[in-house]
């Protein structure tokens, strides 16, 4: 197939239908391939902790049926007449955002992820009024502006986590000028995002300390991920050893936790960068901030430009994600294991290698 703008296309994925979060086969339709669209056959898709929040309606904004998945790697099957960046056969990626207004300050600054009218890759409504559905499916149609090329020679299953976990770490390091060799950084939480934080920061030449709630992952962090140090956050003596020593901490923890112990670890002008999606208010005492001119900031995924940069960076440095592949009919088991933190460190669903059996009612969304 070449440059075609045909009718709607059928897709088959796995969807959650209610806040139980249980996924099952689901048939639906995609919009026709528009002039700026890329029609993609999904090869694989990473599982992010945010997917749990969405399928379980933890944020109170879920719409069902919902096909999750926003770390999507696939092959281009068809392109619209105005598509110039991609051709049939290209291996491409799609992340968290698939639309934006294009005219606000974030959009004009190539920071489309901060657009107030951004469109999520799933659990949202596209400009044509149709629900967006994610990458736990056989196909997707995405505007070319929100598609990136996967570097030649990069394994598809390794590329998938970089589209969210990887760029989520890379973006604040780039934005805050924290890419220089010799910095001392902390990674709080060693999950899918945290493990990429260790690898990327080490590749930038940083001294990296992993901060975790127990010592269960100490050997893994140092022996396999390359961390320089490991501190158990519940050990006061260990935390005291870190006092006033770190240039930054990347906080990936997605549940409530006090910030005071980590603010105390930062140097003058140190930065605590929050990434976990938490609906419970966090707390800290202001002297820890004002007496060290410290910064508490948030950072949300990364832009398309930054996604391209992190893919190129990881290819250049030979960085790989630590993953476990599963078939699509193992999604519910994988989600349950992820809830229990029973994965090292990212699940990637082998969509193309799965048997997408059509068992469910069809919708015309």
UniProtKB/Swiss-Prot annotation:
GO CC terms of this entry: cytosol
EC code(s) of this entry: 1.1.1.195
The protein, known as: Cinnamyl alcohol dehydrogenase 4
Summary of the function given for this chain in its UniProt record: Involved in lignin biosynthesis in the floral stem. Catalyzes the final step specific for the production of lignin monomers. Catalyzes the NADPH-dependent reduction of coniferaldehyde, 5-hydroxyconiferaldehyde, sinapaldehyde, 4-coumaraldehyde and caffeyl aldehyde to their respective alcohols.
Binding site for NADP(+): 50, 168, 189-194, 212-217, 252, 276, 299-301
Cofactor dependency: Zn(2+)
Listed pathway(s): Aromatic compound metabolism; phenylpropanoid biosynthesis
Gene: CAD4
Superkingdom, natural source: Eukaryota
Organs and tissues of expression: Expressed at the lateral root initiation sites, in the vascular tissues of the primary lateral root and the root caps. Expressed in the hypocotyl, cotyledon and leaf veins, apical meristem region, hydathodes, at the base of the trichomes and cauline leaves. In stems, expressed in the cells associated with the vascular cambium, interfascicular cambium and the developing xylem. Expressed in the vascular strand of petals and sepals, anthers, stamen filaments, stigma with papillary cells in flowers, and abscission, style and stigmatic regions of siliques.
GO process annotations (BP): lignin biosynthetic process
Pfam family, one: ADH_zinc_N
Knockout mutant characteristics: Reduced lignin content and rigidity of the floral stems.
Family listed: Belongs to the zinc-containing alcohol dehydrogenase family.
A GO MF term: coniferyl-alcohol dehydrogenase activity
């Amino acid at each position: 197939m070449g440059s075609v703008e045909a009718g709607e296309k059928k897709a088959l994925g796995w969807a959650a239908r209610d806040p139980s979060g249980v996924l099952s086969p689901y048939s639906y339709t995609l919009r026709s391939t528009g002039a700026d669209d890329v029609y993609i056959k999904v090869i694989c898709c990473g599982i992010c902790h945010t997917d749990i929040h969405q399928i379980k309606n933890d944020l109170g904004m879920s719409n069902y049926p919902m096909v999750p998945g926003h770390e999507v790697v696939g092959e281009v099957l068809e392109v619209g007449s105005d598509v110039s960046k991609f051709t049939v056969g290209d291996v491409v990626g799609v992340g968290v955002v698939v639309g934006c207004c294009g005219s606000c300050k974030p959009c004009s600054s190539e920071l489309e992820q901060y657009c107030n009218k951004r469109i999520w890759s799933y659990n949202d409504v596209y400009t044509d009024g149709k629900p967006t559905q994610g990458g736990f499916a056989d196909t997707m149609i995405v505007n070319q502006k929100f598609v990136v090329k996967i570097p030649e020679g990069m394994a598809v299953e390794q590329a998938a986590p970089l589209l969210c976990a990887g760029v989520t770490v890379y973006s604040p390091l780039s934005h805050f000028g924290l890419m220089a060799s010799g910095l001392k950084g902390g990674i709080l939480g060693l999950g899918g995002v945290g493990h990429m934080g260790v690898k990327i920061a080490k590749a930038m030449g940083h001294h990296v300390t992993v901060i975790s709630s127990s010592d269960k992952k100490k050997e893994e962090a140092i022996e396999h991920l390359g961390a320089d140090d490991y501190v158990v956050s519940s050990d006061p003596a260990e935390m005291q050893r870190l006092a006033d020593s770190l240039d930054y901490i990347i906080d990936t923890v997605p549940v409530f936790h006090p910030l005071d112990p980590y603010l105390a670890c930062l140097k003058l002008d140190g930065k605590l960068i929050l990434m976990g999606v938490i609906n419970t208010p966090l707390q800290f005492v202001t002297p820890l901030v004002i007496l060290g001119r410290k910064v508490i900031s948030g950072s949300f995924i990364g832009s398309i430009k930054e996604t391209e940069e992190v893919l190129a960076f990881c290819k250049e440095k030979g960085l790989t994600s630590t993953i476990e592949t599963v078939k699509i009919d193992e999604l519910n088991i994988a989600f349950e294991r992820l809830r229990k933190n029973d994965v090292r460190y990212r699940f990637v669903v082998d969509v193309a290698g799965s048997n997408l059996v059509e068992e469910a009612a069809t919708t015309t969304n």
